[in-house]
């Protein structure tokens, strides 16, 4: 159970950091699928 908890926390942290950086900076790569 501990492995699942640590994995979930790691993925959540990376996801939050990724979205924070992605929304703070304008995407340099043209993303036509998102919009």
Curated annotation (Swiss-Prot):
It is found in: Plastid, Chloroplast thylakoid membrane. Keywords: Chloroplast, Membrane, Photosynthesis, Photosystem II, Plastid, Thylakoid, Transmembrane, Transmembrane helix. It comes from the Eukaryota. The chain crosses the membrane at residues 3-23. One of its GO terms (biological process) is photosynthesis. InterPro entries: PSII_PsbT, PSII_PsbT_sf. GO terms for cellular component: chloroplast thylakoid membrane; photosystem II reaction center. It is a single-pass membrane protein. Pfam families: PsbT (PF01405). PSII is composed of 1 copy each of membrane proteins PsbA, PsbB, PsbC, PsbD, PsbE, PsbF, PsbH, PsbI, PsbJ, PsbK, PsbL, PsbM, PsbT, PsbY, PsbZ, Psb30/Ycf12, at least 3 peripheral proteins of the oxygen-evolving complex and a large number of cofactors. It forms dimeric complexes. Found at the monomer-monomer interface of the photosystem II (PS II) dimer, plays a role in assembly and dimerization of PSII. PSII is a light-driven water plastoquinone oxidoreductase, using light energy to abstract electrons from H(2)O, generating a proton gradient subsequently used for ATP formation. Belongs to the PsbT family. This is Photosystem II reaction center protein T. It comes from Ceratophyllum demersum (Rigid hornwort). The lineage of its organism: Eukaryota, Viridiplantae, Streptophyta, Embryophyta, Tracheophyta.
């Amino acid at each position: 159970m501990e492995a699942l908890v640590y994995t979930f926390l790691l993925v959540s942290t990376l996801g939050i950091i990724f979205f924070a950086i992605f929304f703070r900076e304008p995407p340099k790569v043209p993303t036509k699928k998102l919009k």
